[in-house]
Amino acid sequence: MLDIKFVRANPEKLKEALDKRGYQIDFEEFLSLERERLLLLREIEQKRAIRNSVSQEIAHLKKLKSDNETIDKLIAEMRKLGEELGSIEQKLREIEDKVQNFLLFLPNIPHDSVPLGKDENENVEIRRWGEPSHFDFEPMNHWDIGEILGIIDFERASKIAGSRFAIMKGMGARLERALINFMLDLHTQKGYIEVLPPILVNKVSMTGTGQLPKFEEDLFKIVDPEFYLIPTAEVPVTNIHREEILSEDELPIYYVSYTPCFRKEAGSHGKDVRGLIRQHQFNKVELVKFVKPEDSYEELESLTRDAEEVLKMLGLPYRVVALCTGDLGFASAKTYDIEVWLPGQGRYREISSCSNFEDFQARRANIRFRRRDKKGTEFVHTLNGSGLAIGRTLVAILENYQQKDGSVIVPEVLRPYMGIDVIR
């Protein structure tokens, strides 16, 4: 959520920033609500001043033992004034609720370093690591490799649950588990605290990280009692410190979390229908940071390097891309996408998204900290990134390490977890 004081003081500046993101916001509605809010506040202040003055007069008259008729008349007037005041205060609450709702639909403001652009075609490549894999045979897609090896079963998963689901079997299931354990081990060795959170969360948690109210159509919801299945561990892990005031000495806090994730993929009709790239249920290892504001952009670079390290150790070619203003996520001030090379598709595909939200999520979730030698509190900055998406990493291994005979070489760092060198 944006700072309401900034929104009130800088509507034109905000409109310009959001135009860069491709958001068309009706600020006239907001300004109209603000004008009405200010009028109601003045009226409330005036009536409260009258009430205080008359209350003092009544007390004074009682002290002087004045006639009851005068006192009763003033009391009756105050009763009527109280009813009017209650009605105006109710109107003010309704206006403030509308203002709050308006703020909940406003995206974050892009950082000055974010490249300008309309969509993903104008994202900017920052760096590459490794050379795209080349073969002396026609490389297969991961779904063909998985079915030939008998380690992925899409057909039976479809029978059980429908499209966009998969069953991992045998060495496929073991590879998935090996990747989870490898990533958790790697990140905890770097100082991240492992967290295993609930995968069902309440509405307040979803609102705190920015999924609600704007993206409800992409969430799986349980109606009674009301819960949401998490689309990413970002949601429960960020909400660990919701409504808390941390000390400066506690920061930075680094968490790593493995969870299943669930997404409707409502806007993805016809995209990646085959394979593991876009599933309703998938596993992911997530990195989440709580940091001081002045450190957050250095922490974003560090977070991105931590995600990159996974791919380097697995020997998977990748590139890092800075998202342009038009492709930036709703809550993000700046994002790097890490894209891994997939020979079966002949292109790079996103495997991690590393973002700095500045204080956007912290305002929504009310996560603050207190400096050692300073009064008051400040909002922390939150960051997160995939470290990595397990299914897409498995896809990259199958496609980059495939052999002419249909087997797949196991990356060296995974062999202690797998107990084998080759999947046949």
Swiss-Prot record:
NCBIfam families tied to this protein: serS
Residues holding ATP: R263, K264, E265, E350, I351, S352, S353
Subunit structure: Homodimer. The tRNA molecule binds across the dimer.
Swiss-Prot/TrEMBL domain comment: Consists of two distinct domains, a catalytic core and a N-terminal extension that is involved in tRNA binding.
Enzyme class, spelled out: ligase
PROSITE patterns attached to this UniProt entry: AA_TRNA_LIGASE_II
Pfam families assigned: Seryl_tRNA_N, tRNA-synt_2b
Biological or metabolic pathway of the protein: Aminoacyl-tRNA biosynthesis; selenocysteinyl-tRNA(Sec) biosynthesis; L-seryl-tRNA(Sec) from L-serine and tRNA(Sec): step 1/1
GO biological process: selenocysteine biosynthetic process; seryl-tRNA aminoacylation
SUPFAM superfamilies, per the entry: Class II aaRS and biotin synthetases (SSF55681), tRNA-binding arm (SSF46589)
HAMAP family: Ser_tRNA_synth_type1
GO cellular component, one term: cytoplasm
EC number: 6.1.1.11
Annotated function: Catalyzes the attachment of serine to tRNA(Ser). Is also able to aminoacylate tRNA(Sec) with serine, to form the misacylated tRNA L-seryl-tRNA(Sec), which will be further converted into selenocysteinyl-tRNA(Sec).
Molecular function via GO: ATP binding; serine-tRNA ligase activity
Record bears the keyword Ligase: yes
UniProt catalytic activity: tRNA(Ser) + L-serine + ATP = L-seryl-tRNA(Ser) + AMP + diphosphate + H(+); tRNA(Sec) + L-serine + ATP = L-seryl-tRNA(Sec) + AMP + diphosphate + H(+)
Record-stated family: Belongs to the class-II aminoacyl-tRNA synthetase family. Type-1 seryl-tRNA synthetase subfamily.
Keyword entries, A-Z: Aminoacyl-tRNA synthetase, ATP-binding, Cytoplasm, Ligase, Nucleotide-binding, Protein biosynthesis
Compartments where found: Cytoplasm
Name of the featured protein: Serine--tRNA ligase
Annotated L-serine binding sites: T232, A233, E234, E286, S386
Keyword Protein biosynthesis: yes
